[in-house]
Design a protein with these regions (language model features):
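Rossmann-like flavin
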Residues: 133-260
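N-terminal glycine-rich phosphate/pyrophosphate-binding loop and immediately adjacent elements
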Residues: 26-28, 33-192
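Active-site-adjacent "gating/activation" loops or surface patches in catalytic cores
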Residues: 244-247, 251-282
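N-terminal mitochondrial targeting presequence
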Residues: 1-28
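Short beta-strand to alpha-helix junction loop
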Residues: 216-230, 274-297, 307-309
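Glycine-rich loop(s) and the adjacent beta-strand/alpha-helix scaffold that form part
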Residues: 281-302, 315-316, 326-374
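Conserved SAM/SAH-binding loop
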Residues: 50, 309-313, 330
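A conserved short coil-to-beta-strand element within the FAD-binding core of flavoproteins
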Residues: 307-324
């Protein structure tokens, strides 16, 4: 009986992996491609993931003629809700929201388009073996500080006292890093006065946060380079708590808590913000596809054309080497003043660009980009 159950579980797991695997990313879509109403745009966007959708919404709201092309039959990229089993819908890849900046939600009016956060409380549950040293006790971490402290105290009173200080330390480091992430990256030294002043304001905000909390810069340097286990061992003594927190350092990465640099992911997981609460991640009502759907609705409202089942075969270049449009797999040609790539560098430079248009050294670097941890 047990063998049959194991076989059934293995078959179910194999089916899940086939359905949920990212390798289906470029699988042909069953739907038909509906050509956009025009063949000439200000901007063509390659890829209908959340980044491409946000770009489409902002550019269209700025008055530009935008056409977004997505190969799959559903928009959202990794932020999608799909029926992987009959009657059951899942967030297929991305499963939590938190790094979506609040100004994007406000400026694109995503709440009006149906976007809703669902608080994640408790945020984690860690059971222990009934016959183990902890006698089946479980650890719950959540929003209620007193309840969290009581749960941690089951395993260590010292850890219960240290945990708020650990969270405050991460928030202090977050305050230093966050201003630098809220602006566009510097693309050249020839930026205008407004761009340079904006960068200066962000640096000053970061510096003020660092000066307000002595030791934060040293902590940031350590989080960027040290193993997560090194950080957690210094703060806590309970293996149950350390194992729970270590999941933040390894989730979505082929690494271990003792890998140098894994501590950065501890910081990454407090960079989130949901419903105005820093350091918090949340579910999305309707799954992650509902987030993509809200952004798509904002883009369409601004007159962006979002095309699914649009299989781009080639980026077209003008005589100077600049992008001037795309050719679809069926032969149709769309032209634009600019082409924005919201797809992977591998797909863009190795599959869509003419080989002689990509410098050999750059092409070699792109060929060796490792996607195995994403």
């Amino acid at each position: 009986m047990l063998t049959r159950q194991r076989r059934a579980a293995a078959a179910l797991a194999a089916r899940w992996l086939r359905c949920a695997s990212g390798s289906a990313k470029y699988a042909p879509s069953p739907g038909a491609f509906a050509p956009p109403p025009s063949s000439l745009y200000d901007v063509i966007i390659l890829g209908g993931g959340h980044n491409g959708l946000v770009a489409a919404a902002y550019l269209a709201r700025a008055g530009l003629a935008v056409c977004l092309l997505e190969r799959r039959g559903v928009l959202g990229g990794a932020a999608v809700t799909e029926e992987l089993f009959p009657g059951f819908k899942f967030s297929r890849a991305s499963y939590l929201a938190g790094l979506l900046r609040p100004q994007v939600i406000q400026e694109l009016e995503l709440t009006r388009h149906g976007f809703r956060y669902l608080p994640r409380d408790p945020s984690s549950f860690t059971p222990t073996a009934v016959h183990g040293p902890h006698a089946g006790r479980s650890l719950l971490l959540g929003v209620d500080a007193a309840a969290t402290a009581a749960s941690i105290a089951q395993f260590s009173h010292a850890d219960a006292a240290a945990f708020p200080r650990y969270e405050a330390f991460l928030q202090d480091v977050r305050a230093v890093v966050q201003p630098l992430l809220d602006g566009p990256p510097p693309v050249s030294s020839r930026g205008g006065i407004a761009e340079r002043l904006g960068a200066l304001r962000r640096v000053r905000a970061s510096a003020r946060a660092a000066l307000a909390s002595p030791g934060t810069l040293e902590g940031l340097a350590e989080l960027m380079t040290a193993p997560a286990a090194h950080i957690l061992d210094r703060w806590f003594e309970s293996d149950v708590l350390k194992a729970t927190l270590a999941t933040d350092a390894v989730i979505g990465a082929l690494t271990s808590p003792r890998t140098p640099g894994s501590a950065y992911v501890l910081l990454h997981h407090v960079m989130g913000e949901a419903a105005g609460v820093p350091g918090v991640w949340a579910y999305v009502q309707g799954g992650m596809g509902a987030l993509s759907g809200a952004v798509a609705a904002a883009a369409r409202e601004a007159s962006a054309h979002l095309c699914t089942n649009a299989d781009v075969a080639e980026v077209l270049l003008d005589a100077s080497g600049g992008a001037e449009g795309v050719r679809l797999r069926g032969g149709a040609v769309l032209r634009a003043k600019a082409v924005l790539a919201a797809c992977t560098p591998h797909h863009l430079f190795r599959e869509l660009m003419p080989a002689d248009a990509v410098p050999p050294t750059f092409a070699k670097h792109i060929a060796h980009v490792d996607y195995s941890c994403g």
